[in-house]
Amino acid sequence: MSTHAGSMGLDSRKMAFWAFIGSECLLFASLISTYLVYKGKSLNGPYPHEILNIPFTSFSTFDLLMSSLAMVLALSAIQRGDMRQGKRWLFVTALLGLIFLGGQVWEFNHFAHQGLGLTTNLFGSTFYVLTGTHGAHVTVGVTWLLTLWVQALRGKLGPAQAMTVEIAGLYWHFVDVVWIVIFTVVYLIQ
């Protein structure tokens, strides 16, 4: 039986993943900083206050927050060996992620019909790069969650693999926290 514990008793996979999350923090910090530097500097519209739909995006944000709760419930169930609930909550987490992505696609399409493209103005460029990068990360997370769900359905995921689920949960929670920052900076602070 192999162990992943390092010299300090910490799981090396988890430590490596925290290092990865640190690099992801730098990526999103640079994208958010770029958005803030260019905020309000677009010479032509549409401008954020003309097209951002805060109630719609608030619902999407709530959806993503509920997916974090579902992820906690999935991990807890798997750690307890309750695979029926573990499978259910993994699927719910992925489904909520897909709903969030559907909202992003709808929003991007809506903005495009209102004349906001990637090259329309500085707002469009920074908005689409920031939220698109986040959406790509959510897509990776949903794919990871669905992979874990399929493994669970096939009986290849159980309490012995709980660390794998925990690491996926770290990623998922990170993506959620990043969205809270994006939502606050882009949508709420005008």
Language-model features and meaning:
Residues M1-Q190:
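...captures the hydrophobic TM-helix bundle architecture rather than a specific catalytic motif
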